[in-house]
Amino acid sequence: SLPIRHKLLFCAPLLGALDLSGYLDDDIEEVSVGGESGMDARVCDYDWVLDIRRQCIAADIPFSFHQTGARLRKGGRVYRIRREFQHSQARRAGINYKIDR
C-alpha cells in the first residue's frame, strides 16, 4: 500500500533457505540473491540460491545471483572466494532469469 515505484527483493546476505512464495507477485520487479562477504562471512549454500531461483521462475519474476559471498557451499564442499571474484563467479554460474515485461 506504500507508493513505491520499483519493488525489488534483495536476499543478502543469504544465510538460510527462504520461502518467498507469499511475496512474489506482479508488483515485484526482481529478486536478487547474494552471499556474505568479509573475514567472518557465514556460509551461503548454493542449493538455497537455486531454490529461490525456482520460486522466481514459478512466479515469472526475474532473478539475479549477484554475489557468491566469501564462503559458498556447493556439492557438499565449501569454497572460499576472494572478494574480487565474488560477483564474476556468481555471473559465471549462468542462473540469472530474465523475462520481457
Where do the protein language model's features map onto the residues?
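Auxiliary Fe-S-binding modules of radical SAM enzymes
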Residues: 15, 19-101
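Short, surface-exposed basic-aromatic patches at helix termini and helix-loop junctions that form
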Residues: 1-3, 24-25
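Short beta-strand/loop segments at the ligand-binding rim of alpha/beta enzyme cores
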Residues: 2-11
